[in-house]
């Protein structure tokens, strides 16, 4: 039986979010965290909000099977070729989730002063209703979901070396965010494996 059969859906309706918890040992997670922090060609994220061009403190990097172009908030990103580390993580996540991914967006939050507001990963360049796998390294951060209609909020704490899956119609019906917290002084790296339209 697939491991997911033993795990509980975090969402009460209109979507599926499965939290696997830690999928790596502490030593493995530390190794990936420090290597990604030092070796990734991080760039400040650039977005357009209400017509204003904003350069965020949060940094990103984008990898994929081919030279994908990803459009996010009117910002164009071009995929870099996979590294060996990311391929290893991709294979691990694919085996656990029984899903194939063709791209990965990396986010670096330097501390709790950096976060993300409410949004859905429902851009046209992402396959509709496809699974998105989120792997977290570094500081533990609260990750809330908010239903788009009834505004119900459900939260999970994303641990160092953990995996969260968001599946099917989750992006249509739920928003998610990464709230800021002054208590958090350590960096966090998040990898979101996705299926892009080809």
Positions of PLM-derived features:
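Non-heme Fe(II) oxygenase metal-center motifs and adjacent flexible, charged/small-residue loops
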Residues: 1-198
């Amino acid at each position: 039986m697939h491991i997911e059969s033993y795990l509980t859906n975090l969402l009460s309706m209109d979507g599926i979010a499965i939290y696997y918890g830690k999928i790596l040992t502490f030593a493995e997670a530390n190794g990936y965290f420090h290597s990604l922090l030092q070796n990734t060609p991080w760039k400040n994220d650039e977005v357009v909000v209400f017509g204003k061009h904003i350069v965020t403190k949060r940094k990103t990097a984008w990898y994929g099977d081919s030279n994908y172009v990803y459009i996010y908030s009117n910002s164009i990103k071009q995929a870099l070729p996979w590294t060996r580390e990311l391929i290893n993580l991709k294979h691990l996540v694919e085996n656990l989730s029984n899903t194939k991914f063709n791209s990965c967006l990396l986010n670096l939050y330097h501390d709790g002063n950096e976060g993300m507001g409410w949004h859905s990963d429902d851009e046209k360049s992402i396959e509709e209703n496809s699974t998105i796998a989120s792997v977290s390294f570094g500081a533990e951060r609260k990750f809330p979901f908010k239903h788009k209609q009834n505004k119900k909020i459900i939260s999970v704490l994303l641990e160092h070396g953990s995996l969260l899956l968001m599946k099917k119609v989750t992006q249509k019906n739920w928003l998610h965010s990464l709230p800021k917290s002054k208590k958090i002084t350590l960096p966090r790296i998040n990898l979101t494996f996705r299926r892009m339209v080809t």
